[in-house]
């Protein structure tokens, strides 16, 4: 799923002024900020200048100073182009080494903008206070490009609001002081290419003195039981926390809302804060609600109107909410189906459409739209985190959003979702598990379930009840940038690892979903995302991700559908369609986007498989369906998508859906089905009874117990591909030389989807690097990343190489990535392995091509992406645990072989699927006679239903065969060896041993 954080400011429209702007006689002269005549360089912090930024390599806009005859001021303008899928824009930071600027004498900021009349919003952000432009407090607003040609846009400073979705230092004083300004930023529209031109940024007008003081309330929503009293705290605050220098009055009055006069005691009065009042002084207003004769009512609102003199008023009118009560759907003792039916019967079409809408948390700002749009769900895209990124901040943020839902008529709680795909990977300090490719290598379903349980506990402890995991893709081409999200290339292996669903959700019947350590799981991406053909993608510069999967119906069922059959049997609560297109041979339809395939979503998933959860679209997934937006909405919902992830277009989606229903193009029955499915999961999660975060599990986040599970998983995921001369395990007495780019890098060993969407190299979250773990076990260790330190005098070398982080199509081969080691890593391998016995660890999300160096390497380990617990890798390197991992995918000899998978008619890999040497102290001896006896015993175990014994017999046969092969892998050997692994996973133990015997004979 594509997830990125995006700044979305409050929708505050500004004045669009004519070319000539009058200035009042007492206004100060405008002060230029940028003239774009070359006086400000393009430069990155800490230097002063203009720089671009974005969610990935394609998102930053292009910028240039262009000479224009029509430039509003001077000869040049700042112009550029953009094509942003995540987020992107540009910033002018003032130099860190120079004093901040004082803008407090002015009314606002204005600029010339060349309109394209595209109706899109441009966000403008100011950087106030703090140490510098990257450690300041952010204030934001926006204007709409709904005009053509040059216009001067004036934005009073009073229009800027505190940015709630992100603050680089967690906020400072929540007051726009204007005395220490560090620059500004513009965020450009997302979703379609565009161009822009900007000129003459300057300060204008005389300062509004009310900006120096602000009136705040402690909340925007105050829920109370009928007959209860709401206490509204009103606070005055000033820039720099100085006492107010002029009196501030706050007149208050209860007026309007949905409550009737008999529901509360009318209130009217005034609060006074005299000159000299200390900043932070608080007064209280109490609103008393009344019990009435109605035994059952929906929620009702009582706005408390505040009129402020002498200071900036709160951005919103606080709302007292008299909670819904007495209605059947609120009765936790009733069966879920009855609660759903009762609530559904009361809802309007607009409210139902809201439940089918999911927005990005950054898009809703303070959350007012949650109430206004009756939103059913929010998500955090990759990297969309609160500031600071702590468990406590996550819980506070989500609770603040849930509070907004309390102001809706039926107080339907939000369901909040995140991509916790290898632990709660969004949260700094969480336990980061190996990615799925490594979990598949463990061949340990019980361990997979335990990793899911740890993930669920840490996710739920931050207030998140829904995880967009697991990925059940069957990866068939390692050029795919999402290969590491798969458990492997064999559907039988993927199915065996689906115990993770129980780790996340608990038992199939969902009875534990209300618990504080369980979350709703999502099987993704339905259907065939791992089978797309290289070169078939039409998404930006992607080469394979989101492309076309071309299969027969038989292949579709056997390879790609099988894991979903298992997931439905396990009770998975939600399913997410794939961005990819499915082209079924012979059906005459050609490639059709999965979000539009009613035959697959309605027909197969909900019909044939009997899936009773709800279907959630991927990030802007419906936008890829051909046609206009109304058509996208109609097609996807009619195809069976129940909730649409419309991160920033959530209003457009809800409006379009209502219109499609009213036009008769989407039936109300289809809407009721979708909303029933969504409400069912919300009731099962216990959100109506406990909408707010239960943080009792927060102490377990990143705890020793949780990290022990991740450490065990990291150890079990290590696959020993070669071990000439018994180089591994290492001895603690040996003098070890360690080199390579991935030896000492938490970010690289964790991979993409770690803290941010793409992940990043470096010390991004607490953990133990492989080098740090090795130091704990070695009496004498030398580390030299590039192997430049002297190599003499060492007993053995360990070179840790591989990939840097990426996610999704950004990591596609041909999109700036390949399957080759970097030049620096190749040089380190060559130098160390020429000087001493060496072991090479490949830390990567997929196989890397090492055939040309294999003869020089004594030991080779596929370490995958082990996560934060490097101790697990050291455990097997030093023999604390044996190597037991097996390849979850085929390791190719060359890129030309791709795609290459178990069962292919031509199969000649470097290492076959299922290959994995062991460092157990006793590897069994034997030959053809032993293998024949093992086949007989395996057949008996199979007939008796003795799975553990059958698997043990196949394991013994495999070890015998691998011992004899000693790395001599030919096509005649590899094919039956890989086939045996598939047979093992499908419970055909005797046939698996016979295939291994065939491989033995081919050596």
Segments (PLM) and residue ranges:
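Buried hydrophobic-core signal for structured, non-transmembrane domains
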Residues: 109-111, 184-186, 232-236, 285-287, ...
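Beta-rich carbohydrate-recognition modules and glycan-binding surfaces
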Residues: 26-210
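Long, charged/polar, soluble alpha-helical segments
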Residues: 924-1003
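Short boundary segments that mark the start of a structured unit
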Residues: 208-326
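Glycoside hydrolase catalytic-domain context in secreted enzymes
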Residues: 325-924
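Secretory targeting and sorting signals
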Residues: 1-24
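Low-complexity, Pro/Thr/Ser/Gly/Ala-rich linker/spacer regions in secreted
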Residues: 23-31, 202-216, 239-242, 309-334, ...
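Short, acidic/polar linear motifs in exposed loop/turn regions
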Residues: 115-117, 161, 240-242, 293, ...
